[in-house]
Structure formats: structure tokens, C-alpha cells
């Protein structure tokens, strides 16, 4: 009996949101969360690398650590690329949102 009532609730909620705006909202919020997390991670990594680089310069230990630091900076660049991809997804969501808003307005006329 509960299966039928939960199924009817799912059908009703799907009928209430035929364009999937609720899912789009959840996806948007999750994407913002991921972007915020990436930015914080990049910030921490950058700060750590800069501190290490400063220590290297101050202590004069340059030869062996430069290659390691370059590899770390390459990792940071990869994270930045991933972050850029997330922003592109946000932009696509905004385009989709404008499309659905326009479609919704035209449907009401």
C-alpha cells in the first residue's frame, strides 16, 4: 500500500515540475558547492607552495626542489582547468535556465 502512495506522490511531483527545475536547482547548488571547494583547495595549495618557495629561496636550497615545485604548480594548473570546466557548466546551466524561462513565458501567452 505504501508503494502505491509513494509512487503517486512521485508522479504528482513530476507533474508539478515538468521542466525539471527542481533538479536543475539542486544541480546548480551542488555545482556551486564543488566550485567553492575547488577554490578553497587551490587557495590552500597555492599558499603552501608559496611558503615552501619562500623557504627555499631564503635557505638557498634550490636545485632539488625546483622540479618538485614545478610539478606541484602543474597540479595547480590542472585544478584550475577543472575549475574552469565547472564555471563553463554554470554558464551552460544559465543558458538552459534562460531558454526554459523564455519557453515558459511563451507557453503562458
Swiss-Prot record:
Domain of life according to the entry: Eukaryota
Main location: cytoplasm
Keyword Zinc: no
GO cellular component, one term: BLOC-1 complex
Coiled coil: 63-95
Subcellular location: Cytoplasm
InterPro entries assigned: CNL1
Region listing for Disordered, in residue ranges: 1-21
Keyword Transport in annotation: yes
Any GO BP: endosome organization
Oligomer status and interactors: Component of the biogenesis of lysosome-related organelles complex-1 (BLOC-1) composed of at least BLI1, BLS1, CNL1, KXD1, SNN1 and VAB2.
Known function: Component of the biogenesis of lysosome-related organelles complex-1 (BLOC-1), a complex that is involved in endosomal cargo sorting.
Family: Belongs to the BLOC1S4 family.
Protein name: Biogenesis of lysosome-related organelles complex 1 subunit CNL1
Amino acid at each position: 500500500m505504501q508503494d502505491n502512495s509513494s509512487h503517486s506522490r512521485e508522479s504528482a511531483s513530476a507533474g508539478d515540475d515538468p521542466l525539471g527545475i527542481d533538479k536543475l536547482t539542486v544541480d546548480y547548488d551542488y555545482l556551486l558547492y564543488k566550485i567553492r571547494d575547488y577554490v578553497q583547495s587551490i587557495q590552500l595549495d597555492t599558499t603552501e607552495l608559496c611558503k615552501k618557495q619562500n623557504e627555499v629561496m631564503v635557505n638557498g636550497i634550490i636545485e632539488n626542489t625546483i622540479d618538485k615545485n614545478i610539478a606541484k604548480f602543474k597540479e595547480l594548473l590542472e585544478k584550475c582547468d577543472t575549475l574552469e570546466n565547472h564555471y563553463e557548466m554554470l554558464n551552460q546551466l544559465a543558458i538552459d535556465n534562460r531558454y526554459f524561462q523564455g519557453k515558459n513565458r511563451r507557453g503562458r501567452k
